[in-house]
Amino acid sequence: MTEFETIKNAFARVRADLEIYEFENIGSKSIYIPAGDGEIELEFDGDGKLIDTNYLHD
């Protein structure tokens, strides 16, 4: 199981009420998790390894 799958499944189990969504771009995937007045982005490479995190807000 890749880091991407592990983290995605963990959030789904712990916070099933959150609307977690994913976006696939050329060569990478991101998971977006609501947090405060923004969201946390977890970016993974093509092999499912976590490569970057960001807090996005208006």
List where the protein language model places each region.
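Detector for the mature cores of small, proteolytically processed
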Residues: 27-58
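N-terminal acidic leader/helix
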Residues: 1-28, 56-58
